[in-house]
A protein has these predicted regions:
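Active-/binding-site microenvironments in catalytic and ligand-binding cores
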Residues: 1-82
Length: 82
């Protein structure tokens, strides 16, 4: 599975351009599985094509600025790339 392969690489963040890495009932357990490995999922990213600039992959620095709310399992955050 791709997610477990990424976790083995000791990444910090998984960014996706959709509502999650799993659908329905599988969504919360997978988010927790990643969080248990100190990896957080940033969902609903847009303009990823601008980062790739036509390339199949790109190296970049991604900065996340989560908003601090209590009592939530997911937090809105701002994302900036340089």
């Amino acid at each position: 599975e791709l997610i477990d392969a990424l976790l083995l690489r000791h990444i910090s963040i998984i960014g996706v351009d959709c509502a999650g890495v799993r659908r329905g009932a599988e969504h919360p357990p997978m988010d927790q599985h990643c969080a248990d490995h100190d990896v957080f999922i940033v969902e609903n990213l847009c303009h990823l094509g601008d980062v790739l600039q036509g390339r199949p992959f790109a190296r970049c620095h991604v900065h996340t600025y989560p908003m601090n709310f209590t009592g939530m399992t997911g937090l809105p955050c701002r994302v900036a790339v340089d």
